[in-house]
Each structure stands twice: as structure tokens, then as C-alpha cells.
């Protein structure tokens, strides 16, 4: 199947090995993992960054290769339970940040047709994601606009 905004096909990659339980060398208490997840969220880390930190640094010096295997919950579920989640989903937030950067670039370089198209594609993805999240993680009346995105992220 082709990519969304190009005619290229996707490249296949390796799959993560399936596992039903965490490895023996990574035995950390579930509560300690959840506390560390909330602590990292309060420091300003996104859920994907929290997963990387736990994988690389771990909890109490012991790496946690997969939070869901260790706790039975995803990082975002842990954040929701502890009221530490962001107001915007991470993927939508990242796309909005990209759109803001592209819009500022277009203001400085109005003749840059390639990045004008990149901005259009990014804003299309944002609108598509807003439709997906509207009513669940976003308000029913939420609509994307550059000014609104800039206010929310700064």
C-alpha cells in the first residue's frame, strides 16, 4: 500500500519479538514503574519519551524493556489513571508543532513551494486526526487553526 502523500510504497521492517511476560532480568515492582512514569510525565516528557527513558535508564537501575508487559497497562493508561496526561494527544501535538514551524518558515520564505505543500499535507493530517479524536480526547467543538495551535502549544 502506498504512503499517504506520495506514491512511494512503505518499507517493511522487523517485528518486535512476541512475549507474554517481562524478561527475568527485569523484575521491577509495578507500583515503582507507575510512580516513575508519573514522575517523568510531571517533568514534561511525552509518553514515547517516557518509554525510551524507562528502556534506557530504567527504574531503580533496572531497565524496563516494555511497560505494558511489566504493568499490564500502557503508558498513556497509567497517565490517565493518575491525571497526568496532556490536554492534546502526542501525535496531534507533534503535528501541530511541525505545522507551526512550517508556517513560520513560509512567512520568512514565501516562495518556497516545496514546504508550502509540506504545510498543506501536515495540516491535512492534523484535520484528519482531529476528526478521529473529536468527542473522545478533544472537545466536540474543537477545530484546528494555526492561531489556536500556537496558543495551545506556547
From Swiss-Prot:
The keyword DNA repair does not apply. Residues 21-32 have a biased composition (Acidic residues). Belongs to the universal ribosomal protein uS15 family. PROSITE patterns: RIBOSOMAL_S15. Disulfide bonds: none annotated. Keywords: Ribonucleoprotein, Ribosomal protein. It comes from Natronomonas pharaonis (strain ATCC 35678 / DSM 2160 / CIP 103997 / JCM 8858 / NBRC 14720 / NCIMB 2260 / Gabara). One of its GO terms (molecular function) is small ribosomal subunit rRNA binding. This is Small ribosomal subunit protein uS15. Part of the 30S ribosomal subunit. The lineage of its organism: Archaea, Methanobacteriati, Methanobacteriota, Stenosarchaea group, Halobacteria. Residues 1-32 are annotated as: Disordered. Residues 1-10 have a biased composition (Basic residues). InterPro entries: Ribosomal_uS15 (IPR000589), Ribosomal_uS15_arc_euk (IPR023029), Ribosomal_uS15_N (IPR012606), uS15_NS1_RNA-bd_sf (IPR009068). GO terms for biological process: translation. One of its GO terms (cellular component) is cytosolic small ribosomal subunit.
Amino acid at each position: 500500500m502506498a504512503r499517504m502523500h506520495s506514491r512511494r510504497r512503505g518499507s517493511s521492517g522487523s517485528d518486535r519479538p512476541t512475549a507474554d511476560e517481562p524478561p527475568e532480568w527485569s523484575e521491577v515492582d509495578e507500583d515503582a514503574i507507575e510512580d516513575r512514569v508519573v514522575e517523568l510525565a510531571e517533568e514534561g516528557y511525552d509518553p514515547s519519551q517516557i518509554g525510551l527513558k524507562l528502556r534506557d535508564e530504567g527504574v531503580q537501575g533496572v531497565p524496563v524493556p516494555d511497560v505494558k508487559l511489566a504493568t499490564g497497562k500502557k503508558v498513556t493508561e497509567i497517565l490517565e489513571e493518575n491525571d497526568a496526561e496532556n490536554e492534546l494527544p502526542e501525535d496531534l501535538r507533534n503535528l501541530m508543532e511541525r505545522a507551526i514551524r512550517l508556517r513560520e518558515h513560509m512567512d520568512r520564505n514565501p516562495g518556497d513551494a516545496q514546504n508550502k505543500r509540506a504545510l498543506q499535507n501536515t495540516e491535512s493530517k492534523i484535520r484528519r486526526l482531529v476528526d478521529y479524536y473529536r468527542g473522545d480526547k478533544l472537545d466536540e467543538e474543537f477545530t484546528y487553526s494555526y492561531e489556536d495551535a500556537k496558543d495551545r502549544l506556547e
